[in-house]
């Protein structure tokens, strides 16, 4: 079984749209990301929380985790952003280029222009899984289906409540109860 770091080193390519240094992922450029990336594949770890400065690689860490899930351990992923606009922008500027530039992912996620591809702006379908991106205000996305993996970005900018439904993080966490390995 690969760790997220091993998967990223072997498969991930940084896209020119999102990286000052496009090309193969090198953990040596951000060695402090190795531990949280590898914690993701540690069965004893249930939750990873990071608080850090801007532009130190947290989003790329999450992208590596998403790539790893799609390629190695498929399941439903909910990736929460502060707003739906943020989720759409992230999908266009980060997720779509990552899929395009990573052959392993490109083989698993249908091209966005193919008919019935399952690849829309906010949902990317792959064998055994689906990546759903949403804003923290979207109660229906946060509470509508079972989710194995929950990722969140820019947590400090999230809404305090998803409509009248309550805390977005708690709504998302409740989606994991049916998965023994969430």
Model-assigned labels for residue ranges:
Residues 1-182:
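Phosphate/NTP-binding elements of NTP-utilizing enzymes
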């Amino acid at each position: 079984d690969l760790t997220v770091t091993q998967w990223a080193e072997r498969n991930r390519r940084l896209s020119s749209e999102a990286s000052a240094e496009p090309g193969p992922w090198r953990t040596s450029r951000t060695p402090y990301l190795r531990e949280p990336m590898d914690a993701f594949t540690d069965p004893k770890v249930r939750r990873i929380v990071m608080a850090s400065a801007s532009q130190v690689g947290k989003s790329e860490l999450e992208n590596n985790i998403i790539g790893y899930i799609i390629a190695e351990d498929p399941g439903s992923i909910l990736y929460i952003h502060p707003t739906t606009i943020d989720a759409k922008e992230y999908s266009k500027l980060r997720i779509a280029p990552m899929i395009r530039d990573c052959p392993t992912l490109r083989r698993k996620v249908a091209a966005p222009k193919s008919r019935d591809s399952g690849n829309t702006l906010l949902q990317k379908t792959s064998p055994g899984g689906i990546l759903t991106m949403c804003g923290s205000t979207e109660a229906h996305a946060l509470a509508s289906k079972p989710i194995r993996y929950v990722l969140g970005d820019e947590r400090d900018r999230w809404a305090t409540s998803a409509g009248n439904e309550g805390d977005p993080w708690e709504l998302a966490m409740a989606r994991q109860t049916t998965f023994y390995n969430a």
